[in-house]
Amino acid sequence: MTRVSFDLSRAKQMNLSEFVDSISLVLLETNDYSLLKSVQALNVTDSLFIVEDKGVMLSFNKRGDFLFSTCSLQGEGPHDYYSGMDFTLLPEGNIEVFDAVRCKLLSYNKEFQYVSTYKLPKDILPVSGYLYLSDDYRLFINKNELKLFSVSENKIVDMYEELGIPHFNIFNKNGFQVKGNSIFVSTKHQNYYYELIVDKKKLELRAICEFDFGDEANLDLADFPKGKDERFYLKYFDNNPRKSYVTDKYVDDERNMCFFIYDNKSYFAYQNRRMGINQVYYNEISTQEQFMLANFYKNGVFYYVSEPLYLQFLVDKSLMSLEDINKIELIREDDNPVIICYKLK
């Protein structure tokens, strides 16, 4: 296992130009059929942006032009879904929607035309998200447990429970990152980055990287007293601001990166092994150049969905082309959110 160490005493105010190569903007088309209210998830393919907005899935091309929506598929018909809790992309390009109320997986093509339905047993609940692993396996995610479901056997074949603090959301959908045939897991409130192994109907989380912020700042859930109510732990956070509360971690062939809260500020730790960069940055409220927890990461690019009002605080125009700078002038406050694409060094 690799250990990545960061020195918090050397943390500096956010400076995007030190780790971002370029910034581009995608203005999502705003019309009566594509109006976004509260973006909950983003997925990026080679040709599409797929946005989940309050249970509705909408697709846009790479220019931001609106293509299709599942709005008309919300209902009680045989090919409709009642509650779109989560969605995932299948290898052939179809989109699978998890209806938590009816315990169904419904598959649609890229134009959101109905393909198939799979009925799930109710014992998979409670669930906060899910992930496609293979034609036979789906992974259902709850706040501190994982459930491996076999389609061919129509049942849960294994479970993994993180024996931490029950009030903490250790697992969340954004923490699962697919790279080729491998799946990696970034848990919250922990410094480890895992590879998810599925072998002979068994789940295993294998730690491959540890993020180290120093003995005084590292948070170890094993040290927490058990059996306390949620208020106890919230008060602990308030009383111990100089602990690192990890939100998301990202590891690729060149970089180790982590978003976390420390000393009542949001931080970003960045290491580029090829370039020899190892630095920690923090955001200052109401100042320009802030770097927020991303909605999606792929191939060295962070994607963040920003409301137009906040865009000015999240970009450095010196890293943008003239075309993208001019796009800012076209945006109105009541337009759809903007996807900011941060290409990393």
Which sequence ranges carry the predicted segments?
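Conserved blade-ending motifs and adjacent loop-strand segments that build the rim/top face
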Residues: 208-233, 242, 273-299
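Repeated scaffold domains used in trafficking and secretory/extracellular systems
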Residues: 37-41, 80-86, 124-133, 167-175, ...
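Short coil/turn segments at the loop-to-beta-strand junctions that recur within blades
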Residues: 32-33, 71-79, 120-127, 162-167, ...
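Blade-level signature of beta-propeller repeat domains, shared across WD40, Kelch, NHL, RCC1
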Residues: 300-345
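Asp-box/WD-like beta-propeller blade repeats and closely related beta-sheet repeat scaffolds
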Residues: 82, 99-145, 158-168
